[in-house]
Amino acid sequence: MFGKGGMGNLMKQAQQMQERMQKLQEEIANMEVVGESGAGLVKVTITGSHSVRRVNIDESLMEDDKEMLEDLIAAAFNDAARRVEETQKEKMAAITGGMQLPPGMKMPF
């Protein structure tokens, strides 16, 4: 079924991909992504593992109502989370040669 050394070569490639995936998972967990809302008046910085590092709120919003500010913070966080997901997909595609993960399977595993 496999040519000479085919199975061994396949196993070696699988091991190399696994090592690259592990390195990518570490890289993604340590990266920081900024999400924005309100035309940049609220910025949320999160890690690739979705831990919030910073929340920056423009001074002009401190006088506005609390509910609007809460909505802007939530929107900025959601924007940052979306950016993390997009970055993960791009980096994964670079490693897997564009091979898509099965539906429902996400990085990191």
Curated annotation (Swiss-Prot):
Cellular location(s): Cytoplasm, Nucleoid
Region ranges (Disordered): 1-22
InterPro entries found in the cross-reference section: YbaB-like_sf, YbaB/EbfC
Keyword DNA-binding included in the entry's annotation: yes
GO CC terms, sorted: bacterial nucleoid; cytosol
Domain of life: Bacteria
Keyword set, alphabetical order: Cytoplasm, DNA-binding
Any GO molecular function: DNA binding
Family annotation (Gene3D superfamilies): Nucleoid-associated protein YbaB-like domain (3.30.1310.10)
Family per similarity comment: Belongs to the YbaB/EbfC family.
PANTHER family given in the database record: NUCLEOID-ASSOCIATED PROTEIN YBAB (PTHR33449:SF1)
Function comment: Binds to DNA and alters its conformation. May be involved in regulation of gene expression, nucleoid organization and DNA protection.
Subunit-structure text: Homodimer.
Protein name (record): Nucleoid-associated protein VV2410
Organism: Vibrio vulnificus (strain YJ016)
Classification lineage: Bacteria, Pseudomonadati, Pseudomonadota, Gammaproteobacteria, Vibrionales
